[in-house]
Amino acid sequence: MKQTKIVASISDRRCDQDFIRKLFFAGMNVVRMNTAHATEEGIRTIVKNVRAVSPHIGIMIDTKGPEVRTTGVKEPINYNVGDVVKIFGRPEMESSHDIVNVSYPDIAADVKVGDDLLFDDGELDMKIIDSQGPMLVAEVQNEGVLGAHKSVNVPGEHIDLPALTEKDRRNIELAIELDIDFIAHSFVRNAADVKAVQDILDAHNSDIKIISKIENQEGVDNIDEIIDACYGIMVARGDLGIEVPIERIPGIQRRIISKCVKAQKPVIVATQMLHTMIKNPRPTRAEVTDIANAIFYRTDALMLSGETASGKYPVEAVQTMARIAEQAEKDKSPLNDIDPMEDGKIDQKLFLAHAAIEATKKLGVAGIITDGETGQTARDLAAFRGPNPVLAICYKEKLQRWLNLSYGIIPIHQKDQVSTKAMFTAAVRMLRQKGYLGEEDKIAYLSGSFGEGGGTTFVEINKVKKIFDNSYSFNLPSNGIEDK
């Protein structure tokens, strides 16, 4: 069973329960919805169908974030190298061959002569050669076609847009109403952008978790404060590869993953993981290696976009990613391990989590069980990327969905506040029935004071047989994995 988590994007054009169930059984842990391509009705349908399939699948919704786009066109415009174009920030006016209008009124104030304007995810490049008040003059650098409402990127420049659009605010309120688990905030530049979302959540007393999408140089530069401000990070390599030189992407990805592991925050690697499988049943060797390398870097999760949202082989894409992940987890080298305590940050709970993981390596402990209200102990354990599964008993139903982004964690919702002994015994029995444990195997139990905020205070190690010999019959509820 893979330990790396999989996020799969789903469109409202293909979101029936049978389809979602197939993705779930193939290895999907979290459903992601892109609000740029979904209506409110579509979002409601996706959420309803996901919850009908299983209450254990996490749901993530994107914001649009601070982005610039071109305006409408009567028909696609063809450009040749050397064409000269005037550019204005007039969102209410259509664009033509000679005049391109964009959605941001102050575009001319935020860029300078010599900057490149990249349209349509970098497909068309225009270099600014003159600036005259509200008008920019640009020269086309490559042949290309410009359609309606295409993205506009200006690598290296700060575009002074608000963190949230009105549509974003409406979608966040919809996410609160539907009790969605994660908001993936696009184009996060600093901690203030995260706070803009958090303020809305706080005003509605919502516990939705924020995932910050790193898609520009500002986000990379301010990554430490962004990590501190949010639940997790997504390395969104699509726009990031436009905003920064593409050869820097692997190094940025590696450094962000390392920082997230040290902070015990979930990290997702996204974009073009299996892009070939949008149209073809098999991936390229480069894509297989890309997925494996993300796991070798120690990512928590991987994300599929068009592969599952609109591709011809969505289920096969998830199955393929799961197989690659499982093999990469076996092949990863300890030389690439990241120590969350290497910067001198040692507290009791992190120390005990490290001790439990070391026990799996040096004492032959076959599995770890923990419980809690917040999931922090489980995330501490995930940060050490141990070789064996961690069963996390969750006292909140939403907690098991939040932990669907944490490496190696099998979350189980425990409704009843039974005794610690009963809960522990039932967890061992579940792992035994799933084939993770044998009678002579050792198991570690990480726990502490009961109730939220109590903290981790002890590690117990015992043999499975001895636990069963000294216990009564207890059972944990299903989390859906028994049927896989």
Predicted regions and their residues:
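Non-catalytic helical/linker scaffolds that mediate oligomerization, partner binding
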Residues: 1-484
